[in-house]
Amino acid sequence: MDMKHVKYLALVLCIGNLSPVMAQTASKSLTVDNLVAWQRISGQSISDNGKWVACKMEPWEGDAVVNLYDAQGKELATFPRADRFLFSASSDYLVVSQKPGKMIVDSLKIKKTKKDKLPMDALVIYSLLGDREVIDSLKTFKLAEKVDWVAFQKGRKDSTLYVQPLNANLSTRYEAPAVKAFNFAEKSGMLYYITAGDKAEEKPGLYLLNTETGVKTLIKEGDGVFKQVTFDEDGANLAFLYCAQKNSCYKAMSLWLSQQGAPATEVVARGNQALPKGWVISEHGKLQFSKSASRLFFGTSPEPRQKDTLQLAENRPNVQVWSWDEPVQYTVQNYNKEKELKRSYQAVYHINSGRICQLADEELSQILLGDEGDAPLALLSTSRPYSLSSMWEGRTRSDYYTVSLEDGSRKLLASADYGRYRLSPQGKYAYWYAETDSCWYTLSMADGKKVQLTTPVSFLAWDEENDVPDYPNAHGTAGWTERDESLLIYDRYDIWKFDPDAMKEPVNLTMNGRKNRISYRLVKLDKEERVVDLNKPQLLKGFNEVTKGNGYYKARFSTAASPKELIAGNYMLRSIYKAKNTDHVIYTMESFEQYPDLHYATLDFKKSIRLTHGIDQQKDYLWGTAELVSWISLDGRKLEGVVYKPANFDPAKKYPMIVSFYERNSETLFNYRMPEPHRSTIDYHFYNSNGYIVFNPDIRYVDGYPGESCYNCLMPGVAMLIGKGYIDEKAIGAQGHSWGGYQVAYLATRTDLFAAIESGAPVRSEERRVGK
């Protein structure tokens, strides 16, 4: 038994000693073993055609299972010991990798079985017509995103690559020996692989395989080192780094490019005059094509210093030297050492003209590209000059520049600015929220014109409930509209449309959020969508601050209008995914008493089908309820919190109670709180099931007095519950972790109310916490 189980067993024993046994006949109390075995949804997917849904159920310890469902909610197939699962591009297949059983592997490890003798994974290719192909001894696999093909390797000592269609009736299949790496293009059936070759037919090098035509092309022959192999989006172009000296300590990389499946040519060689003097192509810099594939971005860096391989390691000096006035603390330098050694600076190769331009350097190292790399200007920034002052200011200033992707020329936009600039999708504007004045700004990349979009009087952009000794955060943005014409900004409740040049008045698109105290937020269902289309219907999620319930709403942002309610109530809605080619969605619905089972519906939510039945796990166990309560703090503020009561609650009885909290949690009234043997907090269902009440009060802070703020908020809440007559005043405990751990430790110095207090990983020193 591990320490986690030991600790929870101790809690079970404590419960047995401290609380009376609840008189129950039909139901049982949860145990630690129940928590460990509790099945949760750890993954879900809907096919592109919306006809099939796969869901992964997984215990906290043990083997997961993937279940396949059709649109009527019928379970079609089950895949035990499941790991990864993916639908094919055509939606005709489900591919599932399976692990060997955990108990079997654990027993073999106990017997000291060698690693190469342990069982391997398997790959199941399941046709949605019912056929099943199983590939044993799986090492790794990749599924193409746009065609029904899979590539895989199997066997520990065999590095042969197998590439085949998912349709087992097709005889087409390709094999390549001694393959080191492989991958498919994002939007085509093109596959690259790197092989050491064999003595018969396959030369060593980088190959391109067109799975749709069967044509295989040797892109670059060589047994050297290949790095950063990258397709453009459509798979028409392929770029990579190559060094022929595979056994040298330092890999002198050059940049190669293959276009339209032709053999690759070297486009940026080592020592290219366009690179800064003494700089080289970095093997750690990410290769990236622009959206149009007219530009190829790569990383450069100063040539790294080489170790003296003629000197023994024990004869090398092993000292660490730093000075008191360094702008970055030595501990931070030491922590980031490996990251800094691999740091690279972006450059661009213009494919059509062959020109090379260095964009970033050591002085201006951070870069943001606009329009997926096709914008004429990029945004450069650095916080290097302000590293020292950031230690006591608590935030970092930055300098911002535009840089031309054509010639590398730079123009200063802002100096010593606290804002974190971002780029609009097409790269026409930089935009940011200024914490120091709680306003949103834009800046034209073309002419440097700065525009203030909001003022503290005209628009409440900030967190109105901020209660920490710092500037309030923004509520964020919903995104940009097409052609960078408008920026959609959230306030506490609504979504507003702003003209980035402030030539038009802002428009409240959702209109009634603040009036009804519903916080609307845009749900992005298409992961590839870069902008918000004002003419398309949009899905919003709404949170009701009064009831704590959730809903989905329909809106169309072409005109301002109150969103149309689709589904809303006293529950939590989340984990929504849409089929790519239809309006079908999957989502979860939950409350404290209702398991977050997976549901299937169309976007109007008129008919919803429950697919999974995780709630069945509860039927044999005592299950508590959640209730919203309110009271007045000692300093006169109205507060809310949640009381979790045991099953079959009897107000005439006295119950032991645990107070557990972390800042504000009343908005989680309808969270299921998945049963879990957690390392840092109590499990609410476990304690409810064993006869305890759990109280989670909201804590609102006054600057400089976090502990006393906790006392002022929590104590009258506890008194309010005691006043109801069902709390055993001699059996009240408090539990908190980290920031909550600090506060329960403070409570121990202010009151004798609590019979026991557990303070987990508490903040021991406010000075040290600020220093971090």
Which sequence ranges carry the predicted segments?
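Beta-propeller folds
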Residues: 23-585, 590-596, 600-601
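Bacterial Sec-dependent N-terminal signal peptides
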Residues: 1-27, 763
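Serine-hydrolase catalytic core recognition
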Residues: 574-772
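Residues in and immediately flanking transmembrane alpha helices
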Residues: 20, 46, 308, 673-675, ...
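Short intrinsically disordered, low-complexity coil segments enriched in acidic
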Residues: 2, 14, 132, 167, ...
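Alpha-helical transmembrane segments
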Residues: 5-12, 44, 576, 704
